[in-house]
């Protein structure tokens, strides 16, 4: 259970008090919690604080008060920690490698410390872990933790606030019994992931288990909760589905945008605390603005003290050179600039779903390891058949089987058609669990590397029954590509890894389903398919327009798709560079947008193009976004793509800054003045500045005990002795130890307990500090080579330029696709003057940096993704992005995959043991990139990028490189019809082929050959697929526990065409158990009855007695000869009309059969029936019939069938379809 734990035993300490103060600013949440725990044990123990995080939350402050000690954390370069850069081996007392202690400090209390806590790639994202050192008996521990989060939205557009479970744990009536049961269940579920939990075996397995246990407390605790709401617009209402709440307006509130929420009654401790906020304009784009901590003049002074600026200006002192340096430093100076946050939740809930227009790329990833043999594979086959038949003609699809290796049905996703569907059904019928162990990482990498299809969101369906030994890598891979890939996972059986199945869905905003023994897969598969087929706004991008005098860094860097209830979030860091531009043009604009992921791989953050005259004054003060209502799509589409493109081409000197991946850049609108904080607030300190003196209110320490080097803070003009002494979390927000703070020593004296080389202070907050000339940043060194040669100084600005620049006007354009229709929304905003308002409300605002935290987190994620993508292309080329992520992390005190939290005992001026280790850290890969690049170059083939997967991706015991296993027909076509590039690298590999050799050109060639192959084999595949599902044993004999004869609907579903129709033939009669004669006699179409009366073998109408016996088989309606009808009524009708009527009647009868004979399994075939009905609605019914007539005739058929089954005398001649 998360919270404060005994490091050795894993036991949780009871919570005695929880005080939560929070603020919602638009769609962002800033939260500060004060958690007090009591040590009721008589023995001291090592404390470990574990705090779970969701995908949109980051920790921005942490402090723990333990008696006379204060513990905080500091962000350090993970590579230096893991490489031994901070190794204290030279310290007189022995210690564990990687832990930093002050020289001469005894570490006797840690001599019996168990092994370190191991965090894999996934756990380090979703867990905050801090070592608190020794906690004395009967001692209270107060923990202050601050987080910033992006809030989720509901389909209605409401904003949801859910208090973390650690801050408000439940109190069960029988806590001991309940907790023990929960732990046992969690361990039993995921024994392959987590292992057994025994005292002294504290490791990553236990931490993973913690995530599956319910957070509870053995007793009631003191609970206080306060939430300030600063809405993006007027609030339509605030409610709580869990508690009665009280709403009060702050004394300084100017409108209904701001309100304060508290609990009206005492907390009941039996449920979480949830608040729903309803904006008055929930489906319009909203832009919110948060100012930086420096004015324009202050930033200019700060900039002149930076080493990269000094070096750059020596080479060329022109004004353009200065703006270039500012642009390249934007990620380091995020706290100093204004941040804009764009939020947009389109109204997809009110859209009437149209299944036939459902777009998407459906990829089915099926576990074919040996453990899937037997009943599990039979279940998967039936579920896959239903899933394939449920897809719509507008989509793309592919099937991939994986085990130790993997194979794909198609070289790339194919259009859903009769040909591809027939081949897929045939492949499913022959599928076996014969591919060895379980290795899901390699096929996932192959899927993610495939090009994204415009207008088709990638929807990945994963079916597995096992576990892998690299769950963290798998989840991190999917997390990094969640913008393009959404995962719906299915876990079969008791041995499946729950963390893997749930994690795949959680990190990609999909859904997870776990099947118990004997449970059917079809209803859960259809449930997920319905979610995937919901209305979607795909290819969502944001384009920003700013004046020429600004430099902007936008995030994220990838286009995304929005399903009902999801929102678009984007950030922009805006620097006003008007002081550094000579002769600026007021009508000149810059347009910031993004590239698609398959386009340029060059640096996009700093590449730009000019933009000509753009915004007019009248467009800069309004939000012109329209609600996203598909019924009013024409009104919502403010500007089509074509018109926008033509307009752009006519403008001169456009400037466009790109971000490497296809990203949505978002911008916020100016935030109106909100109510001040309801509680007294301390002086405002920037995020990265330590506020250790505030802790004197919780301890008996005086200022002398804080022996910390706070020179950077002193240089910024702040008096550390003047902070007001306030109590409670509402009085201040804890922060992390700033990068410039080191243990107190005489100036100039170095301590060995900290690093042998002092940490670089290139990004310290002191405007006058210069960066050291040694150890220049690798990022700055690399980019400096791209600078222009020295030239004469031209930075003299116009003397008449005003000292205070004019407000910055901007515009954001949100674009997306829905049903192949381009839609666009526009919102304008005004930034105002840069920097805080001195002496104003912002100085006392505790929540004035929430957007900065989230923007820095988004920028770091962008750099991490860019580094990963560049690393796949060429090892070593991603170094610049890794260093940029590292710089941003340390400058903004936001964690990244290249940095780590290091605990610091402030009162003793020393580091505590880090406790945490990262076995698969990306930082280690940074250190070994050169050696790894040589290894990859040796194993790469012809395309300039690695063609196989490394051994670390393989299943346990498999040390070979992974390859794409291409088996016999139908996938054997790859060996027969390969492109030249494929033959070159696959000829010597036999049945196995290289993983990544399907380049874009070779894929197009294979697809052409593949399509020809399908056309030649269409009839054979259709017949084989139908016979396979008709001839296989009944599933009822395997799984059915009841005598319901409606169970076997699979044979009928297997006959459905890709369009949704059914053919009237013998296979259809066999699947429905209805003789052809009865189908034709009861058909409302004349051609069907005439075909019976005109056959040479029959000369009279069959009697009721004949109908009760098995009639002879007849050819299908769509294939019987028309020659006997030449003399009849339909003799002149073309064959196409006869085939069409056969499809109409068979489809109506098929729907009626499902409803009549398999109603109890409606949740399994509902999409199949919906597709068939959708096809019917689009057809014209001949002979003057209507669809109502067809459905009535089908219902009458089953009335007659019931009479025939009961052997009742019934005169067929009394039935006339014309009277129905």
Swiss-Prot record:
It is found in: Secreted. Disulfide bonds: none annotated. Residues 19-149 form the VIT domain. Residues 715-807, 937-962, 976-995, 1093-1115 are annotated as: Disordered. Residues 361-529 form the VWFA domain. The keyword Secreted applies. InterPro entries: VIT, VWA_domain-containing, VWF_A, vWFA_dom_sf. CDD domains: vWA_interalpha_trypsin_inhibitor. Residues 796-807 have a biased composition (Low complexity). GO terms for cellular component: extracellular region. Keywords: Glycoprotein, Phosphoprotein, Secreted, Signal. Residues 1-18 form the signal peptide. It comes from the Eukaryota. This is von Willebrand factor A domain-containing protein 5B1. It comes from Homo sapiens (Human).
């Amino acid at each position: 259970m998360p919270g404060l734990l005994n490091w050795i035993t894993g036991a949780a300490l009871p919570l005695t008090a929880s005080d939560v103060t929070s603020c919602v600013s638009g769609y962002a949440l800033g939260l500060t919690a004060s958690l007090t725990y009591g040590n009721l044990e008589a023995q001291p123990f090592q404390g470990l604080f574990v705090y779970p995080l969701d995908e949109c939350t980051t920790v921005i402050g942490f402090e723990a008060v333990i008696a006379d000690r204060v513990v905080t954390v500091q962000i350090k370069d993970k590579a230096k920690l893991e490489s031994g850069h901070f190794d204290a081996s030279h310290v007189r007392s022995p210690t564990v490698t990687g832990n930093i202690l002050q020289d001469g400090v005894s570490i006797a209390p840690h001599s019996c410390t168990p092994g370190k806590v191991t965090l894999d790639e996934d756990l380090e994202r979703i867990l905050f872990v801090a070592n608190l050192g020794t906690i004395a008996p009967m001692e209270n521990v107060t923990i202050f933790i601050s987080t910033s989060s992006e809030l989720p939205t509901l389909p209605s557009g409401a904003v949801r606030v859910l208090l973390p479970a650690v801050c408000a744990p439940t109190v069960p009536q029988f806590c001991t019994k309940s907790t023990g049961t929960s732990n046992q269940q969690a361990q039993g579920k995921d024994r392959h992931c987590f292992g057994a939990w025994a005292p002294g075996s504290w490791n990553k397995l236990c931490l993973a288990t913690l995530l599956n246990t319910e957070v509870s407390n053995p007793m009631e605790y003191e609970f206080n909760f306060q939430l300030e709401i600063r809405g993006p617009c007027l609030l339509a209402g605030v409610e709580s589905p869990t508690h009665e709440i009280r709403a009060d307006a702050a004394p300084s509130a100017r409108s209904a945008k701001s309100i304060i929420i508290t609990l009206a009654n005492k907390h009941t401790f039996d449920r979480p605390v949830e608040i729903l906020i309803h904006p008055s304009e929930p489906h319009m784009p909203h832009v919110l603005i948060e100012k930086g901590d420096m004015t324009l003049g202050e930033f200019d002074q700060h900039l002149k003290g930076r080493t990269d600026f000094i070096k750059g200006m020596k080479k060329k002192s022109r004004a353009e050179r200065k703006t270039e340096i500012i642009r390249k430093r934007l990620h380091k100076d995020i706290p100093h600039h204004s941040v804009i946050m764009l939020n947009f939740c389109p109204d997809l809930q009110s859209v009437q779903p149209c299944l036939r227009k459902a777009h998407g790329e459906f990829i089915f990833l099926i576990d074919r390891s040996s453990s899937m043999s037997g009943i599990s594979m039979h279940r998967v086959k039936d579920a896959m058949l239903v899933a394939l038949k449920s897809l719509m003609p507008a989509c793309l699809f592919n099937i991939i089987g994986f085990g130790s290796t993997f194979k794909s049905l198609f070289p790339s996703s194919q259009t859903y058609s009769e040909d591809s569907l027939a081949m897929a059904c045939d492949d499913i019928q022959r599928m076996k669990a014969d591919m060895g162990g379980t290795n899901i990482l390699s096929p996932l990498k192959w899927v993610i590397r495939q090009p994204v299809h415009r207008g088709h969101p990638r929807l990945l369906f994963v079916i597995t029954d096992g576990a892998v030994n690299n769950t963290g890598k798998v989840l991190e891979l999917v997390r990094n590509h969640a913008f393009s890939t959404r995962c719906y996972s299915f876990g079969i059986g008791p041995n499946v890894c729950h963390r893997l199945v749930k994690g795949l869905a959680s990190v990609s905003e999909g859904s997870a389903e776990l099947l118990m023994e004997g449970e059917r897969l079809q209803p859960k598969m259809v449930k997920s398919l319905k979610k995937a087929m919901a209305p979607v706004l795909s290819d969502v991008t944001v384009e920003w327009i700013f004046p020429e005098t600004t430099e902007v860094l936008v995030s994220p860097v990838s286009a995304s798709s929005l399903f009902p209830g999801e929102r678009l979030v984007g950030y922009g860091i805006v620097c006003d560079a008007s002081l550094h531009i000579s002769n600026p043009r007021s009508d000149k604009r810059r347009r910031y947008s993004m590239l698609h992921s398959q386009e340029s791989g060059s640096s996009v953050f700093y590449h730009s193009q000019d933009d000509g005259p753009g915004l007019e004054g009248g467009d800069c003060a309004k939000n012109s976004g329209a609600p996203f209502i598909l019924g009013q799509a024409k009104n919502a589409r403010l500007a089509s793509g074509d018109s926008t493109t033509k307009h752009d081409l006519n403008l001169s000197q456009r400037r466009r800054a790109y971000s490497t991946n296809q990203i949505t850049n978002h911008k916020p609108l100016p935030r109106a003045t909100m109510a001040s904080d309801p509680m007294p607030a301390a002086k405002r300190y920037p995020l990265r500045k330590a506020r250790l003196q505030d802790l004197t209110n919780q301890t008996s320490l005086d200022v002398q005990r804080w022996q910390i080097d706070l020179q950077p803070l002193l240089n910024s003009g702040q008096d550390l002795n003047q902070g007001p002494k306030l109590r409670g979390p509402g009085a201040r927000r804890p922060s992390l130890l700033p990068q410039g703070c080191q243990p107190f020593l005489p100036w100039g004296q170095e301590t060995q307990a900290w690093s042998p080389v002092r940490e670089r202070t290139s990004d310290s907050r002191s405007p006058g500090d210069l960066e050291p000339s040694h150890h220049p940043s690798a990022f700055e060194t690399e980019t400096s080579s791209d600078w222009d040669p020295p030239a004469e100084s031209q930075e003299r600005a116009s003397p008449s330029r005003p000292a205070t620049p004019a407000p910055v006007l901007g515009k954001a354009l949100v674009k997306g696709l829905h049903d192949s229709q381009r839609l666009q929304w526009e919102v304008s905003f005004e930034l105002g003057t840069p920097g805080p308002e001195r002496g104003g409300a912002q100085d006392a605002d505790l929540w004035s940096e929430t957007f900065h935290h989230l923007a820095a987190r988004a920028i770091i994620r962008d750099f991490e993704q860019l580094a990963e993508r560049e690393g796949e292309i060429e090892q070593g080329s991603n170094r610049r992005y890794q260093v940029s992520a590292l710089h941003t992390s340390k400058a903004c005190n936001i964690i990244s995959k290249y940095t780590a939290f290091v605990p610091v005992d402030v009162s003793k001026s020393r580091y505590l043991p880090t406790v945490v280790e990262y076995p698969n850290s990306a930082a280690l890969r940074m250190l070994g990139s050169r050696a790894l690049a040589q290894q990859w170059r040796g194993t790469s083939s012809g395309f300039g990028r690695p063609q196989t997967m490394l051994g670390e991706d393989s299943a346990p015991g498999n040390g070979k490189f992974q390859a794409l296993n291409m088996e016999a027909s139908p996938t054997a076509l790859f060996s027969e019809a390969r492109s030249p590039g494929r033959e070159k690298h696959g000829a010597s590999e036999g049945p196995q082929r290289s993983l990544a050799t399907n380049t874009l050109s070779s894929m197009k060639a294979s697809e052409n050959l593949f399509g020809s192959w399908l056309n030649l084999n269409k009839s054979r595949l259709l017949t084989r697929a139908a016979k396979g599902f008709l001839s296989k044993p009944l599933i009822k004999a395997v799984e059915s526990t009841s005598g319901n004869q409606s169970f076997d609907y699979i044979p009928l579903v297997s006959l459905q065409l890709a369009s949704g129709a059914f053919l009237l033939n013998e296979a259809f009669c066999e699947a429905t158990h209805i003789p052809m004669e009865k189908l034709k006699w009861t058909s409302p179409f004349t051609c069907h009855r005439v075909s019976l009366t005109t056959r040479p073998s029959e000369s009279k109408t069959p009697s009721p007695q004949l109908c009760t016996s098995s009639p002879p088989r007849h050819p299908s309606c769509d294939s019987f000869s028309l020659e006997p009808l030449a003399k009849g009524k339909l003799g002149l009708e073309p064959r196409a009309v006869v085939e069409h009527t056969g499809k109409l009647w068979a489809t109506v009868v098929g729907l009626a059969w499902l409803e009549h004979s398999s109603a109890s399994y409606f949740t399994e075939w509902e999409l199949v029936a919906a597709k068939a009905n959708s096809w019917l609605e689009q057809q014209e019914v001949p002979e003057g019939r209507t669809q109502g007539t067809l459905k009535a005739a089908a219902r009458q058929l089953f009335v007659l069938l019931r009479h025939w089954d009961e052997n009742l005398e019934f005169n067929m001649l009394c039935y006339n379809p014309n009277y129905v």
